[in-house]
């Protein structure tokens, strides 16, 4: 049947080429037109495969070269040619070979006064122009001159023809040769005048497509330097800026506004950042480097988070690059367990693992070790709280005992917190779903006293004490809160304030924090503490939804940037804060906000007031680096209440951000904390993230083209006058906070049951101890059997915070630590059957000094795992050494997991390692024997997908990339043979699936994920074939047997959203407004031929209609365009 259809079509085409009878030719064209006007494009592609393009082109040439071309034939023929040519990739080459290009141009020139004939010629020229080869020939043969004759002078007659001419011209101007020709011939002025004619006279916005077509021509022209110069000389910036103001609020003008904005962005002169140098304001004389040395040979991978595919994936080219990065060398993919350290060096790790060799007496806590005093007793808890209960406790004005509250729920295990399904909500989380939160709370999360009680009793002593707000909000590390009116009382001010406004926060003690902060060493010697870190944080009473982005917010910000260029006198441009200035600037500056960032984890380098309530901010690069500007954390004070302040962070590096997809920065108000609501909350409106006009100095990049920067802009309305507020990229978690947390944990546990050991893995380059925590259960007795079971427990290794800016990893780790020492039956089982070795912060120096990614040497420590050196990367060297030591004793970890944060995707997910999946993805064909591997690496992610509300299997990946060869995940997998070696990524933003869909992550959700990870480890063990009957029996006795069986079966069922290979899905749709402004953007309307198809179809249905349109109004002078 198919052969008959093919032969029938070929017969039609053959007859068409050889027929000299007009009626027969018209009949065949009618049949072909009817065939191609219905159904799918498959019919057109089938016709192309049977020589349809050649037949139509040959018919065109034969008809056009006759003494009197018959337009009754040419019109339907042109329509068919345009329709077929859009789908034929070789259409241009075929047209050149058959000389159809020349005859089409000749016909167009002869029909300038016949709009219907000319319109059809232009449609086919539009198809020719989309081909590089035929487009070049059109330019050589004078097509642009022909088009300008059609476009000028301005007229409202034949508007469909004018529209078609603009589209052909826009397609031609994608060629650099045509661009230069257009600039040299003065067409820039002509196009500007034409656009202004249409803009000023099209008052009803009837001809938006023509105006858009002219703007596309200009957009291509300004992509060329000479084109931009001509455009600027013709006052193009001022002209288009003025025209944009008149139509911003008109939704029907979206095409025009978007094109204008892109042209203005393209023409904004590139400039250097307002910094003395791109290098960090902080330096450190690290071994092997000098303070002025910058990292060389930077690659795109240096800007990626571990496992992050941070770059946009909008094209097939990016996909090809990703596939090229896949490791295909079997020798590098194969696991090769072995030691790269001498055995004598491994002996140093004996002291870090006393549980393997010490006697029972040596392990027992000494009499003085029981530190459960009245200050920390209530910090002990019996199981990790759900997000809702944690919030409820933190904002409970009755200050009920934490211990008592936990005792009330001791019989309720973490199992009650797991998600009930992809669309379900955990029972403990129902109350915290996005409820009807007060509008002001949604915006700032601050104005409402969550307890519902009157706050006057707290506010009164605050006012009576008349504290110096600046001193309170950023106290000196000496624990002094100076009071300007009563200096003699300054020494006891801190104690007095803490006593007056005491509010218990679980696992936090300001007194201990001060002590730890005094011991912390920074590169520049910080002398102040951030108030939120001292005072503490409680999750807000309700989950905060993602911010709905308003359409047009980005273009408004960009137009404000353009306004600065065009009207510089309107800009204040006053530096109000700078780390580069030898003396503080703000003492003599008034009528502006005051900024501060010289505290632990703080990052703000410079603040410039540009308008009364608007500031440009620049964040500091990592120490000894000129890169990695993302993390920010600073104090701002001196504000007015109920006034929107706009902040523009102008030196961001990432090409996209979750700030474009609902994420908000975090804010902590000192006054709110003193009023009993100490919380980091998501805040900000009018948020967007886009490429700006700043460029890094090429000299900084070793002569390479200077890197472009991005702007994060947001508005904050502060709740109180003269408050002091802290703003941060994400919820901060400092090194001193960690050390305080570990100390409180150690004090709060029952040392008769829980073996908790806090060691020092090593000293960092900055002189700070890197903590190593061991958690397990004490042996039941000192009998040989119990001691043997104790020493034979398998190990679980968890690390975090190798990248300082990923503070969410620390909050997940906090949840893990608190759960493991809790009285939850699951935690008890885990302690009895595993030894947990935890390094909660692999990069203390980076965290302390406000880095985003690097160590004090300016290098990414997660790219140093292949061959770390003790004097250069001590924490990585000893972490790897400890892992090698465990492997050498036959105690390699069951699971290794490195906690990270992810800035481009939502949810929580794992990256693992699979040789088979990597080779499959890369398209490599190898023998079956080479593909044999342990597939258990998929089990834990599948379990977490069933249990953890924030986790999704869909985003997990198990590919091994060349660029990740030196990361912890890959090195532990390859060198130590740990098949379950993972990176766990937590979004900075929130969830787009499951119970938390549409909500931003708070610290409660992150801590909950840390606890859920532990539950996943237990389920993994219970499901394993080697699970002992004793453990199963113990689990049944501690947990509800029916409930346990339910979850074991549930985690054994196949995941509905996973298969043999889980494909990674795009996390976000295209942004509503273009982040970039490249001239060849795929969103250009001329790239989409659907509209041209529609025009052709419409013309075919109304071919008897006259297209002539009368000019509206009289007396308009037609302006000639030259």
UniProtKB/Swiss-Prot annotation:
It is found in: Cytoplasm, Cytosol. One of its GO terms (cellular component) is cytosol. Widely expressed at low level. Expressed in eye, muscle, pituitary, testis and to a lower extent in brain. GO terms for molecular function: metallocarboxypeptidase activity; tubulin binding; zinc ion binding. Signal peptide: none annotated. The active site is at residue 985. Its EC number is 3.4.17.-, 3.4.17.24. It is an enzyme of class 3 (hydrolase). Residues 731-1021 form the Peptidase M14 domain. GO terms for biological process: C-terminal protein deglutamylation; protein side chain deglutamylation; proteolysis. It catalyses: (L-glutamyl)(n+1)-gamma-L-glutamyl-L-glutamyl-[protein] + H2O = (L-glutamyl)(n)-gamma-L-glutamyl-L-glutamyl-[protein] + L-glutamate; C-terminal L-alpha-aminoacyl-L-glutamyl-L-glutamyl-[tubulin] + H2O = C-terminal L-alpha-aminoacyl-L-glutamyl-[tubulin] + L-glutamate. Residues 287-338, 1099-1122 are annotated as: Disordered. Its cofactor is Zn(2+). Belongs to the peptidase M14 family. PANTHER family: CYTOSOLIC CARBOXYPEPTIDASE, CYTOSOLIC CARBOXYPEPTIDASE 4. This is Cytosolic carboxypeptidase 4. It comes from Mus musculus. The gene is Agbl1.
